[in-house]
């Protein structure tokens, strides 16, 4: 296919038009008085959102060169979302400011390579400044503040804070759609996996159709059990103790299952059989997790252990186990806390090493089940459109809160970026490198300018006053007051602000040093040009 090529100024200008088109659509959502953007959906109702990355992903421009510019800025939003989970609009605003100011200077004769060096130097100093003013996040109240700011909703903030308090910072918090109008929190304590009882005859509560075992012994094996003789010795020891038994195996069937059911119905002893969770290597890893959590041993031939010679001391214990048709929950396993901590650290190391997103997600789930539990935030709303928008906001708030716990918080509302202004301004450089530093200085003001603009105020006046205020004091656009941002709970996670600045600078530097842009040439008239001639097929009616 033939290519269309544009060079230097013409190429950069075309890309800038695309950058502006996307950034102008995204930046109207910034701040407490930001507006919404409506996105057309081919099927169903339109999506109304103020989430920067969602808007950026939807934008596709007709002109190929402009579209490349738009896609580069969409990449800034997307990358920031991947790393920090929020701050996508801030990143887009910063990228647009750097690209626009940079192109002005390059057009006026500045050397793009020198400008790029200046941008990189200034961003490095700005990041050091951010870490200096960053404060660690402590306590439920601080977590609630971060979440409330991101979701623009105090109720959501307190829900997320409660969820993180209940399941710990490593816990899994999932967001689901609720059937009702209210948003609520549901927490599953202990370890839960998606396998239910092998037979409905094993239930202890026929109303709820669940089996509840108090202080049970837990036999964990990766073998298939078909013959009751294999587990009879250990079964007799459990019966003597007068305790119920949870049997987790690859499968329990045939005579073994029938014997367990018959004895349960007769009231001889209470045993519930459950299939092992997961598949393949992941199954073995999850069984090992359960054995660490309950203080038992995994009975596997890999370790030379045999079911027939299993002693009661090799079984795990828990204060309670609840088994339903689809799930098994182990509450308060009796495992050694030092061993559980070691296992948690081992899984954390695997999370850091893996490159697969799927593996990472599964490892995070295992980590959560060992470290705390699983919380589900059920989002409710009056209409489907509102539900989708609310769910997106809560996802952003959750990501934002996690980022805050990780790297601390800085003053929100664009204040932190202006707080590092003086540190960046102190850089001594010459020529085009200094031009690059000046571009970053101008860009640091842009988020607060946009927040003020969206609130119907003049950004320049607020920026000038902010530069002269002490660190931490900023402008609250929601109330039009000057306040101590951290005291008032108007905060941003350091990780979000850092990622936004880094990613914006990276793409801006790349775009400024672009000298040629290549795109597919649109085909003249398109390939469908011959189609109208098919009208002659109408004569085929005579063939009947």
From Swiss-Prot:
It catalyses: ATP + H2O + a folded polypeptide = ADP + phosphate + an unfolded polypeptide. ATP binds at residues 29-32, 86-90, 413, 476-478, 492. It holds the Pfam family Cpn60_TCP1. GO terms for cellular component: cytoplasm. SUPFAM superfamilies: GroEL apical domain-like, GroEL equatorial domain-like, GroEL-intermediate domain like. The keyword DNA-binding does not apply. Keywords: ATP-binding, Chaperone, Cytoplasm, Isomerase, Nucleotide-binding. GO terms for biological process: protein refolding. Its main location: cytoplasm. Together with its co-chaperonin GroES, plays an essential role in assisting protein folding. The GroEL-GroES system forms a nano-cage that allows encapsulation of the non-native substrate proteins and provides a physical environment optimized to promote and accelerate protein folding. Belongs to the chaperonin (HSP60) family. This is Chaperonin GroEL. The gene is groEL.
